[in-house]
Amino acid sequence: MNNLGRHILAEIYGCDELILNDKEYIERIMVDSALKSGAEVREVAFHKFSPQGVSGVVIISESHLTIHTWPELGYAAVDVFTCGDRVNPWDACNYMGEKLNAKNITATEVKRGIFEQPVAVKASNE
């Protein structure tokens, strides 16, 4: 069976509250996670909430990485979606868990774009 990509949905618990509330650090580890998995970073956008929490996205040529943090709970919700076989989303997910000092990670992989038969991609100008 063919698929277009792999999507990791990670629940990351027991993280350091100060780390989860540090926008610059979160941005750096997200970009580093993408690079360590072999992805090509295209764009980055992060936001620090008041009084706490950070959300962000790293757009990669292969798709995206996102994070939403709840420092008061020591929790981060992370998605890593990669298209093709060149990049391993688990490498990025595991690196993030390590850098967040996570005590527990629960993650699920979802195959995206599952097709019974090969799909021909047509150019939009045809």
UniProtKB/Swiss-Prot annotation:
Q: List keywords of the entry alphabetically.
A: Autocatalytic cleavage, Decarboxylase, Lyase, Polyamine biosynthesis, Pyruvate, S-adenosyl-L-methionine, Schiff base, Spermidine biosynthesis, Zymogen
Q: What top-tier enzyme class does this entry carry?
A: lyase
Q: Record keywords: Transmembrane helix included?
A: no
Q: Which SUPFAM superfamilies match?
A: S-adenosylmethionine decarboxylase (SSF56276)
| GO annotation (BP), single | spermidine biosynthetic process
* This protein's name: S-adenosylmethionine decarboxylase proenzyme
- What's the short name of a Pfam family annotated to this entry? AdoMet_dc
Q: How does it assemble?
A: Heterotetramer of two alpha and two beta chains arranged as a dimer of alpha/beta heterodimers.
| Record's catalysed reaction(s) | S-adenosyl-L-methionine + H(+) = S-adenosyl 3-(methylsulfanyl)propylamine + CO2
The entry's free-text remark on the cofactor is:
Binds 1 pyruvoyl group covalently per subunit.
What family is reported?
Answer: Belongs to the prokaryotic AdoMetDC family. Type 1 subfamily.
User: Is Lipid metabolism found in the keyword set?
Assistant: no
Residues recorded with modification Pyruvic acid (Ser): 63
Residues at the catalytic site: 63, 68, 83
Q: What does this protein do?
A: Catalyzes the decarboxylation of S-adenosylmethionine to S-adenosylmethioninamine (dcAdoMet), the propylamine donor required for the synthesis of the polyamines spermine and spermidine from the diamine putrescine.
Among the entry's GO cellular component annotations, what is one?
cytosol
Where are the residues marked Cleavage (non-hydrolytic) as a site? 62-63
The gene behind this protein is speH
Which co-factor is required?
pyruvate
Q: Name one GO molecular function term.
A: adenosylmethionine decarboxylase activity
How is it modified post-translationally? Is synthesized initially as an inactive proenzyme. Formation of the active enzyme involves a self-maturation process in which the active site pyruvoyl group is generated from an internal serine residue via an autocatalytic post-translational modification. Two non-identical subunits are generated from the proenzyme in this reaction, and the pyruvate is formed at the N-terminus of the alpha chain, which is derived from the carboxyl end of the proenzyme.
What does the record give as its pathway?
Amine and polyamine biosynthesis; S-adenosylmethioninamine biosynthesis; S-adenosylmethioninamine from S-adenosyl-L-methionine: step 1/1
Record EC number = 4.1.1.50
